[in-house]
């Protein structure tokens, strides 16, 4: 049973799951909670937390990007207001959080970006000068690299707010994550999908993260059982490799960096690209690693190894001079 928006006090036997209050955050937290409930039989109580990123109207680059959606959730977890919290993994800082650990990463949804355009237009059909909205410096740089003649507009707001700007004629299109549209039942709004090879997405995009207090992930307690019920080893390895790029570059999530990792035929492949904000230049590095096994420890080791090699190549090629990378990690 899922109980939404309950008080911070624990209901007898209920597992309290913290979430942001946006429709997308609630939808994805409900999906994870339902999976935990099915696997464990636990009652789940959602605890809604308002974050600075939800209330501020500044752009992500002005806010500093990383941590604006995570800090309040982490505070609620440390204060005992909830037993675990659910983040969009792409919004979770890569630097360790004192007293907290990343306990589980469920199976990733579609990691691609989508175009949601007026009149069903595909990306190549947008006229010169068409206005395309995005709040992501990475997406803005990628769009400029592919179509320099587009008018890229910095926007904020939830999925419905962004889509409404297209339907109202304020914008010709917006770029949104396929995973978010799917979780909200709005994938029909997508008029085109960008391939990961031409438009690599934010490290961790499409994946969720379950964060807990340090120690709660171990043993056979209810929190550890909940984590084990939804953790997906290959998603965890792929996103660990992607996030190792951000960590190694000392970059925040507002940095114009795209990364894609996948496991195929026994190899863990990672490709990452750093973009100049105007889209006029970019650097790409790709490497692969062979895990000793597909156990969690060996996958994690391979992910960190391939991430370090990709970062080393990017930095040696001048990535730090190409784009503003520094940010809270």
Curated annotation (Swiss-Prot):
Modification S-(dipyrrolylmethanemethyl)cysteine, positions = 253
Q: Which reaction does it catalyse?
A: 4 porphobilinogen + H2O = hydroxymethylbilane + 4 NH4(+)
Q: Which cofactor does it need?
A: dipyrromethane
Q: What is its EC number?
A: 2.5.1.61
Alphabetically ordered keywords of this record? Porphyrin biosynthesis, Transferase
Report the cofactor remark: Binds 1 dipyrromethane group covalently.
Enzyme kind, highest EC tier: transferase
GO CC annotations?
cytoplasm
| GO terms for biological process, alphabetical | protoporphyrinogen IX biosynthetic process
Query: One matching Pfam family, short form?
Result: Porphobil_deamC
Q: Which cysteines are joined by disulfide bonds?
A: none
Give additional notes from the record.
The porphobilinogen subunits are added to the dipyrromethane group.
Q: What family is reported?
A: Belongs to the HMBS family.
Q: What does this protein do?
A: Tetrapolymerization of the monopyrrole PBG into the hydroxymethylbilane pre-uroporphyrinogen in several discrete steps.
Q: How does it assemble?
A: Monomer.
**By what name is this protein known?**
Porphobilinogen deaminase
Q: Which organism is it from?
A: Leifsonia xyli subsp. xyli (strain CTCB07)
Gene name, per UniProt, is hemC
């Amino acid at each position: 049973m899922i109980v939404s928006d309950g008080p911070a006090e624990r209901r007898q036997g209920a597992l309290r799951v913290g979430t942001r209050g946006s429709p997308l955050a609630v939808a994805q937290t409900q999906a994870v909670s339902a999976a935990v409930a099915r696997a464990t039989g636990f009652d789940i109580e959602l605890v809604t937390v308002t974050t600075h990123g939800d209330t501020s109207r500044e752009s992500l680059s002005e806010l500093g990007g990383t941590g604006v959606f995570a800090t309040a959730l982490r505070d609620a977890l440390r204060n005992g207001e909830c037993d675990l919290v659910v983040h969009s993994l792409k919004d979770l800082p890569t630097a360790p959080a004192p007293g907290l650990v990343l306990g589980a990463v469920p199976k990733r949804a579609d990691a691609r970006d989508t175009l949601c355009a007026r009149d069903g237009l595909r990306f190549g059909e947008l006229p010169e000068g068409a206005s395309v909205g995005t709040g992501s410096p990475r997406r803005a740089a990628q769009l400029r690299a592919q179509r320099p003649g587009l008018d890229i507009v910095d926007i904020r707001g939830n999925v419905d707010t962004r889509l409404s700007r297209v339907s109202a004629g304020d914008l010709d299109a917006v770029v949104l994550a396929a995973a978010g549209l799917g979780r909200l039942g709005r994938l029909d709004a997508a008029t085109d999908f960008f391939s990961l090879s031409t438009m690599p997405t934010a490290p961790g995009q499409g994946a969720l993260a379950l964060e807990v207090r340090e120690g709660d992930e171990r043993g056979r307690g209810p929190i550890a059982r909940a984590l084990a019920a939804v953790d997906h080893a290959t998603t965890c390895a792929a996103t660990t490799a992607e996030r190792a790029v951000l960590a190694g570059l000392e970059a925040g999530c507002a940095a114009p960096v795209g990364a894609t990792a996948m496991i195929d035929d026994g190899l863990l492949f990672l490709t990452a690209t750093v973009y100049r904000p105007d889209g006029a230049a970019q650097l790409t590095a790709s490497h692969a690693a062979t895990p000793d096994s597909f156990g969690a420890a060996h996958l994690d080791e391979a992910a960190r190894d391939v991430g370090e090699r990709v970062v080393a190549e990017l930095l040696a090629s001048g990535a730090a001079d190409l784009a503003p990378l520094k940010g809270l990690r």
